[in-house]
């Protein structure tokens, strides 16, 4: 899974249609070669008519996912895109801090996520353990648990774990949630790996293997010495 940045919609320096063509050319070629198609979430956030055009561009190019900035497009905009039905919908909650950071303002995530699930989103951001923002680990865990609860007898929504993630948080994330039914998103944790992006991806996979084995960050690094590369690079921020 790969996604656009939530601030990257249709700017002059990266026009939406050109970006879709460039990225899907690589993804489709990779799928033809390997039989595995990477899901890429293109950020369609815009006015309603433009969002629908962006959505149709993804479909015609062979894409599988559209991203919307929930707090920017609103419930009506989100439902309009979700109702089109051809793509998975990745819901980004950028701007969430203004709705929840102060205890006397806004809405609790357990209620917030229900609104977007009713609109039809398939994936929704929940922050992450030992994240780079203000939110506590306890709050993140509550958010993940809320996503796992069936709504109106239906399906759950996939929590998207992100924000300063590099792999070392995986053991604590799994210890506290006991699930691998999530998207674990890392930007710098992959791209800034000392041995390159491919090594960054392999490192995340190995950290999660260790997490499911029940290892702590320290015991994982002891059992799998290659994990010390990311540990030395990104520090011991694990939860």
Spans of model-derived segments:
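Glycine-rich, proline-tolerant flexible connector loops at the mouths of alpha/beta enzymes
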Residues: 2-20, 128-135
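Ser/Thr/Pro-rich, acidic low-complexity intrinsically disordered regulatory segments
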Residues: 103, 229, 234-239
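Catalytic alpha/beta core domains of metabolic enzymes, predominantly
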Residues: 53-55, 61-186, 199
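Glycine-rich beta-strand-to-loop/alpha-helix junction loops that act as flexible
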Residues: 5, 40-45, 161-165, 186-188
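Short beta-strand segments at enzyme active-site cores
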Residues: 2-5, 37-43, 68, 125-126
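Flexible, glycine/charged-enriched surface loops at secondary-structure junctions
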Residues: 4-5, 33-37, 214-222
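N-terminal active-site wall of soluble small-molecule enzyme domains
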Residues: 18-19, 23-38, 42, 46-59, ...
């Amino acid at each position: 899974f790969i996604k656009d940045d939530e601030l990257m919609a249709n700017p002059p320096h990266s026009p939406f249609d050109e970006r879709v063509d460039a990225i899907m050319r690589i993804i489709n070629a990779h799928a033809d070669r390997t039989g595995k198609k990477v899901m890429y979430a293109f950020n369609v956030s815009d006015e309603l008519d433009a969002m629908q055009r962006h959505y149709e561009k993804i479909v015609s190019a062979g894409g599988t996912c559209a991203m919307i900035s929930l707090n920017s497009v609103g419930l009506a905009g989100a439902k309009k895109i979700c109702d089109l039905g051809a793509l998975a919908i990745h819901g980004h909650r950028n701007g969430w801090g203004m709705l929840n950071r102060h205890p006397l303002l806004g809405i609790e995530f357990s209620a917030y996520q229900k609104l977007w699930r009713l609109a039809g989103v398939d994936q929704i951001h929940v922050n992450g353990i030992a994240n780079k923002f203000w939110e506590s680990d306890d709050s993140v865990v509550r958010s993940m648990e809320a996503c796992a609860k069936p709504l109106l007898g239906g399906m759950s929504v996939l929590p998207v774990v992100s924000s300063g993630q590099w792999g070392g948080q995986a053991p604590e994330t799994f210890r506290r949630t006991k699930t691998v039914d999530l998207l674990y998103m890392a930007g710098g944790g992959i791209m800034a790996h000392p041995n390159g992006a491919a090594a960054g991806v392999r490192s995340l996979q190995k950290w999660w293997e260790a997490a499911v084995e029940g290892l702590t960050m320290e015991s994982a690094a002891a059992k799998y010495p290659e994990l010390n590369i990311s540990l030395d690079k990104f520090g011991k921020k694990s939860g």
